[in-house]
């Protein structure tokens, strides 16, 4: 949606199939409509597929490392972005239900100076898990690897570093209002 002040607002509900294509199409459409800044809403986003995350980050960010995964044996895989990028001020809205790929989306945009992060502290789910079903209906999830930002920063146990910690307590979206205010300052 293009807001009256020229801000493009894009909600990303998860990083599952086609997320990157849909978000890229939304950014392109908003830019064609004259968006002067972008706000990505990843509140209540539980994460998803890493290839969707890295495709979207590659589209948004300039050349360089954007994501690192390390398996239990210590083998690292570094994902890099190409030189093409979106040069608009950006903000990312997060809350306590923003997890995994959604956290890394916000963290990498912030780390590269492309976006500010506004909202509530996140959990810091920075690892991959494999789930094994148990015979009586339960399941056990075992961590099989860890994730890092392009510079090697971990989110495990810390979550995101917020540029503005803001809670929505009433009918107004105070987090969006704070993000818009921060983008005006930039």
Give the location of each predicted region.
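Short acidic, Pro/Gly- and aromatic-enriched capping/linker segments at domain boundaries
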Residues: 136, 141-146
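Short clusters of small/polar residues that mark proteolytic maturation junctions
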Residues: 71, 144, 159-160
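Acidic-aromatic/histidine active-site loop/patch
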Residues: 156
């Amino acid at each position: 949606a293009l807001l009256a002040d020229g801000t493009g607002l894009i909600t990303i509900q998860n990083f599952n199939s086609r997320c990157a294509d849909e978000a890229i199409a939304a950014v392109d459409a908003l830019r064609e409509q004259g968006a002067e800044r972008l706000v990505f809403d990843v509140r209540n986003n539980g994460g998803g597929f890493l290839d969707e995350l890295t495709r979207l980050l590659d589209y948004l960010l300039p050349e360089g490392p954007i994501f690192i995964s390390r398996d239990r044996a210590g083998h690292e895989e570094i994902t890099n972005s190409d030189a093409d990028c979106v040069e608009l001020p950006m903000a990312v809205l997060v809350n306590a239900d923003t997890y995994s790929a959604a956290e890394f989306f916000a963290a990498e945009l912030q780390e590269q100076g492309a976006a500010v992060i506004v909202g509530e502290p996140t959990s810091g789910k920075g690892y991959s898990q494999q789930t094994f079903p148990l015979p009586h209906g339960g399941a056990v999830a075992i961590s099989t690897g860890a994730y890092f930002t392009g510079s090697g920063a971990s989110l495990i146990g810390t979550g995101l570093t917020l540029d503005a910690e803001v809670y929505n307590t009433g009918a107004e979206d105070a987090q969006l209002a704070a993000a818009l205010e921060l983008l005006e300052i930039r």
